[in-house]
Each structure stands twice: as structure tokens, then as C-alpha cells.
């Protein structure tokens, strides 16, 4: 498996890289969080567009993305609009979802773009092609906030993402018990060991699944998400706590 190199960050090589989400509603707060991220011990920054109060103004989003990028320095920027069906904050039609993304690819500033696996496949494949031509890396993803699918299904979804030309394949699932957490970790190890040609990102959400966020280097997950202020998903740890855990596992692996 080859690492994905974005600016100076090598995703899929060494310890999992830490991503910090920006989940502020206003432009002022978004820019403040972007500036603050320069001093955080993180590797990438994700701007969650579905939290932004003016996301329906595509021109404004593009302009704001450029300002965010400027404030990040050498830290790569991942742009994500998480739909409500996969745990996002805002109702948004699929038509607007793709229209926003196309506008960002043409006029915005970003290094990576998050696209949901189960979005319209024809529209998604067109967007993937367009983004790759612009030098943007694609994170294909799936989030299940209700349950943990079987190990076979988790692996199948990750392989489907890879076949659709994802640069990074991501899945997040909700455990109901400890066995579900083990299912996610086993699926991660199976995918990483037998099938992955690109970096994969997996997590079991909530308090129960927290262990999956700090053991990526043991099972094969290349990114982990840590909060600076407000968490963007259940079970997310603060950046510093996350970094300390990653160092501990690195020293003892």
C-alpha cells in the first residue's frame, strides 16, 4: 500500500495522522478555529461545511475556504458536507450537495474532499473524476449511526470505495456491545492485510468504541479524528489526549 501524500503529510505511513474538525456556525468562528489549529498538535484540518450557517451561498463558501486554507499554513484541508442521513447537521438536497462540491472543486481551496459512498453513484463518479483532475484527493466514506454491520459487510464497503478510485477509504460504525467493536477492528485488520492498496480509516463510535480511535497503527487505520473544542462525532477525544495515546501505542507496539 502506498501512502497518500498531501503537502508534507504522508497518510498511511507511520502513526495514524490526527484530523481536527472545524464545526463552527459563523465565518468569524470558522476563521478563528482555523487560526488556532496552527498551534494544535494535529496533522490535518477538516472543515465540516454542514455546520456553516451560510453554506447555501456557494460563492461565499468558496471564498471562505480560501481564507481557511491561508490560515492553515502547511496543514492539509479536508472539506466535508455530512448529509443528515449519515449524521450531518443540516438538511441539504442531493442536487445541492453535488452542486456545492463542483463549485468548490472549480473555485474553492481544498486538498481533500469527502464524498459519501451511497450518494448518487453516477454524480459521485463524475465529481471524483473532476476533483482528481484538479489534484484533489478523494475520501470515500460511509457512516452507520445505528449499528455495526458484519465484518464481511464492512470489508465489502471498503473494497467498493477502493474500486471507485478513492484515495482514502473511510467507514464509521456504531457499536451496541464490545463484540461490535471487535468486529470493526477485525474488519480493519482484514482489509489492511489482504485488500488495501490505499489508506483506510475506520472507527467504532461512542464511548464504547473509543479504543478504535487510538489503535489505528495496530490494526491498519491511517487517520483518527480529535476535537479542539466541540466534537464532531460521538466518542471523539481531544487532540492532546489522542496524541498521548498514539505515542503510548507507538512506544509499546
From Swiss-Prot:
E.C. numbers: 4.2.1.10
Catalytic activity annotation: 3-dehydroquinate = 3-dehydroshikimate + H2O
A Pfam entry, by short name: DHquinase_I
GO BP annotations listed: 3,4-dihydroxybenzoate biosynthetic process; amino acid biosynthetic process; aromatic amino acid family biosynthetic process; chorismate biosynthetic process
Modes of activity regulation: Inhibited by flavonoids such as datiscetin, naringenin, marein and phloretin.
Gene3D superfamilies: Aldolase class I
GO molecular function, one term: 3-dehydroquinate dehydratase activity
Active site (UniProt): 143 (proton donor/acceptor), 170 (schiff-base intermediate with substrate)
Pathway involvement of the protein, from the record: Metabolic intermediate biosynthesis; chorismate biosynthesis; chorismate from D-erythrose 4-phosphate and phosphoenolpyruvate: step 3/7
Top-level EC class as recorded in UniProt: lyase
This protein's record includes keyword Lyase: yes
Keywords recorded for this protein, A-Z: Amino-acid biosynthesis, Aromatic amino acid biosynthesis, Lyase, Schiff base
Residues the record lists as binding 3-dehydroquinate: 46-48, 82, 213, 232, 236
Its biological purpose: Involved in the third step of the chorismate pathway, which leads to the biosynthesis of aromatic amino acids (AroAA). Catalyzes the cis-dehydration of 3-dehydroquinate (DHQ) and introduces the first double bond of the aromatic ring to yield 3-dehydroshikimate. The reaction involves the formation of an imine intermediate between the keto group of 3-dehydroquinate and the epsilon-amino group of Lys-170 at the active site.
UniProt subunit comment: Homodimer.
Recorded family membership: Belongs to the type-I 3-dehydroquinase family.
Protein name per the record: 3-dehydroquinate dehydratase
Taxonomic lineage: Bacteria, Bacillati, Bacillota, Bacilli, Lactobacillales
Gene encoding the protein: aroD
